[in-house]
């Protein structure tokens, strides 16, 4: 005669099911999570301006052209790059909602700084006078207009996320999921 051993295990999965239901409910509207992720991206952009460095690589932005820097100094400006009047830095905006988080700007010249490139060729004409006048090499010049072939602008990326930002985002997502599972998020 062979003896049979029968083991029966009953598991109460109601707590697991309830936790998964809470997580599912929290994921129906991820706006609170996306708001936190947009804040991380916004802080990354703020640091890029403060450090004058690429937020993705950490590399310092290329220095200003010495001639351009001298012209700025003549007008009294000796401040930070990309912040002559503050328009670009103060027009960085966050957008977020269910399933998306983004940081950007609608400033027209932002793209040339973010990606680098060559500005459009154009004519320069006087605003309030009949002619332009300047001195160069001890010689005087007067012209009604001059053609500018465009300027090469180096990339000075200010939008983006680096390794630390990505880690912060991953931790934020994990904390959001953990809080939802534990019933601390609605």
Segments predicted by a language model, with ranges:
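Short, Lys/Arg-rich flexible segments
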Residues: 1-186
